[in-house]
């Protein structure tokens, strides 16, 4: 008897705080996912980093042996300055001197990466004025970009997602949930094909040092707004039509970001995902719901009474003959 009572009380406790338990498991799962990613990245990339460090030490030692007139301190000062300039997007290589980082097309590409919060980091402002303007420009531009993307995605979603699903549901009688799932999968497949696979194939041809995997990696890192900056198109030494290429990449990033948001919005509108998300949300209190219901009822009652009073006044204004006739009947006997 006591065991059954204890079990039922535990079940009621779990059901009462189900949202809190789900949220706790969500936080724990997210932290474990972070740790899992750190372990995998460290185990995969650390050996390659060690090999690269050993190779650089050998090259440095060989260079110093071949140039005995140069001290190690002088070489390190030179390399430090070169690396510092490289971090700002400036290269000392002779065949890279013709590529400017702040011509109009490069600045347009930089502005698009700032507003979309991609931020490759290969080109950064050098002057104090440029850094100050970048802060002000981002503070205004990022919310403006979010507003712009929200409006564009909302309009596209109506024509691309909601109307097709409603059409197949009404015209052919298919289940709305099934149609929504099939439509979301097809839309995701088309988006991945048009903005990942096809551009990756194009980049692998236009960029000399990129293979298909590296090109696909760039597309994903860019359209997911991660923007690591290890792969940036249009930075080749002998890049043809560089200005036109930069403008095309800017348009691709903007259209691809819109397409990604449309797909995400389409999946978020699925009934199953809505139910899944509600598991982690805080439920409204019953008292709060009752207050909202009472306020709604009061507003409805007051609006009804106001409408009734207005209708009575309109009837009085629209019936002048009735009023004059009744007054004549009252005054008539008195005059006689």
Curated annotation (Swiss-Prot):
Residues with Phosphoserine modification: 326
Which residues does the entry place in the Extracellular compartment? Answer: 42-103, 123-132, 203-211, 232-243
Site positions for Important for increased permeability to Na(+) when K(+) levels are subphysiological, renumbered to this chain? 118
* Activity regulation description: Inhibited by Ba(2+) ions and quinidine. Inhibited by quinine. Is slightly inhibited by 10 mM tetraethylammonium (TEA), and only marginally inhibited by 4-aminopyridine, charybdotoxin and dendrotoxin. Lowering the extracellular pH to below 6.5 transiently activates the channel, and then inhibits channel activity. Inhibited when the intracellular pH is decreased down to pH 6.0, but this may be due to indirect effects.
Please give the residue ranges the record annotates as the region Important for intracellular retention in recycling endosomes: 293-299
Expressed in which tissues: Detected in bronchial epithelial cells. Detected in heart left atrium and left ventricle. Detected in cardiac myocytes (at protein level). Widely expressed with high levels in heart, brain and kidney, and lower levels in colon, ovary, placenta, lung and liver. Highly expressed in cerebellum, and detected at lower levels in amygdala, caudate nucleus, brain cortex, hippocampus, putamen, substantia nigra, thalamus, dorsal root ganglion, spinal cord, pituitary, heart, kidney, lung, placenta, pancreas, stomach, small intestine, uterus and prostate.
PTM section of the record: Sumoylation is controversial. Sumoylated by UBE2I. Not sumoylated when expressed in xenopus oocytes or mammalian cells. Sumoylation inactivates the channel, but does not interfere with expression at the cell membrane. Sumoylation of a single subunit is sufficient to silence the dimeric channel. Sumoylation of KCNK1 is sufficient to silence heterodimeric channels formed by KCNK1 and KCNK3 or KCNK9. Desumoylated by SENP1; this activates the channel. Desumoylated by SENP1; this strongly increases halothane-mediated activation of heterodimeric channels formed with KCNK9.
One Gene Ontology cellular component: apical plasma membrane
Chain ranges passing through the membrane? 21-41, 133-156, 182-202, 244-267
The protein's superkingdom reads Eukaryota
Residues with an annotated glycan are: 95
Role description: Ion channel that contributes to passive transmembrane potassium transport and to the regulation of the resting membrane potential in brain astrocytes, but also in kidney and in other tissues. Forms dimeric channels through which potassium ions pass in accordance with their electrochemical gradient. The channel is selective for K(+) ions at physiological potassium concentrations and at neutral pH, but becomes permeable to Na(+) at subphysiological K(+) levels and upon acidification of the extracellular medium.
What name does UniProt use for this protein?
A: Potassium channel subfamily K member 1
- GO BP, one example? response to nicotine
- What further fact does the record state? When the external K(+) concentration is lowered to subphysiological levels, it takes several minutes till the channel has reached a new, stable state characterized by increased Na(+) permeability. Likewise, when the external pH is lowered to values below 6.5, it takes several minutes till the channel has reached a new, stable state characterized by increased Na(+) permeability. When raising the K(+) concentration back to 5 mM, it takes 40 to 70 minutes for the channel to regain its original selectivity for K(+).
Consequence the record notes for mutating residue 122 to N: Decreases channel activity and abolishes inhibition by acidification of the extracellular medium
How changing residue 250 to L affects the protein? Slightly decreases the increased permeability to Na(+) ions at pH 6
**UniProt keyword Ligase present:** no
Q: How does it assemble?
A: Homodimer; disulfide-linked. Heterodimer with KCNK2; disulfide-linked. In astrocytes, forms mostly heterodimeric potassium channels with KCNK2, with only a minor proportion of functional channels containing homodimeric KCNK1. Interacts with KCNK3 and KCNK9, forming functional heterodimeric channels. Interacts with GNG4. Identified in a complex with PSD and ARF6; interacts only with PSD that is bound to ARF6. Interacts with UBE2I.
Organism expressing this protein natively: Homo sapiens
Example of a GO MF term: sodium channel activity
Key words of the record: Cell membrane, Cell projection, Cytoplasmic vesicle, Disulfide bond, Endosome, Glycoprotein, Ion channel, Ion transport, Isopeptide bond, Membrane, Phosphoprotein, Potassium, Potassium channel, Potassium transport, Synapse, Transmembrane, Transmembrane helix, Transport, Ubl conjugation
**Localization per Swiss-Prot or TrEMBL:** Cell membrane; Recycling endosome; Synaptic cell membrane; Cytoplasmic vesicle
């Amino acid at each position: 008897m006591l065991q059954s009572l204890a079990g039922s009380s535990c079940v009621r406790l779990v059901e009462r705080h189900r949202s809190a338990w789900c949220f706790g498991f969500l936080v724990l799962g997210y932290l474990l996912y972070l740790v899992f990613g750190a372990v995998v990245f460290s185990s995969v990339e650390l050996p390659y980093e060690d090999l690269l460090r050993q190779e650089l030490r050998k090259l440095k030692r060989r260079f110093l042996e071949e140039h005995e007139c140069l001290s190690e301190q002088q070489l390190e000062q030179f390399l430090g300055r070169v690396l510092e300039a490289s971090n700002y997007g400036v290269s000392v290589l002779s065949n890279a001197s013709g590529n400017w980082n702040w011509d109009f097309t490069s600045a347009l590409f930089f502005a698009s990466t700032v507003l979309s919060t991609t931020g490759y980091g290969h080109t950064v402002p050098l002057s104090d004025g440029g850094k100050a303007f970048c802060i002000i420009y981002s503070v205004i531009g990022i919310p403006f970009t979010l507003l712009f993307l929200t409006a564009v995605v909302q309009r596209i979603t109506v024509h691309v997602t909601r109307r097709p699903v409603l059409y197949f549901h009404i015209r052919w009688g298919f289940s709305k949930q099934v149609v929504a799932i099939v439509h979301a999968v097809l839309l995701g497949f088309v988006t991945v094909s048009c903005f990942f696979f096809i551009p990756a194939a194009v980049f692998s041809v236009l960029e000399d040092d990129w293979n298909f995997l590296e090109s696909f990696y760039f597309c994903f890192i860019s359209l997911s707004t991660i923007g690591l900056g290890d792969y940036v198109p249009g930075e080749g030494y002998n890049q043809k039509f560089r200005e036109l290429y930069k403008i095309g990449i800017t348009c691709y990033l903007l259209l691809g970001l819109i397409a990604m948001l449309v797909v995400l919005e389409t999946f978020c509108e699925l009934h199953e995902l809505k139910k899944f998300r509600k598991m982690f949300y805080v439920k409204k209190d019953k008292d709060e719901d009752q207050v909202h219901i009472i306020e709604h009822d009061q507003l409805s009652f007051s609006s009804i009474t106001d409408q009734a009073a207005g209708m009575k006044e309109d009837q009085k204004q629209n019936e002048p003959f009735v009023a004059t006739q009744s007054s004549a009947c009252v005054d008539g006997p008195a005059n006689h």
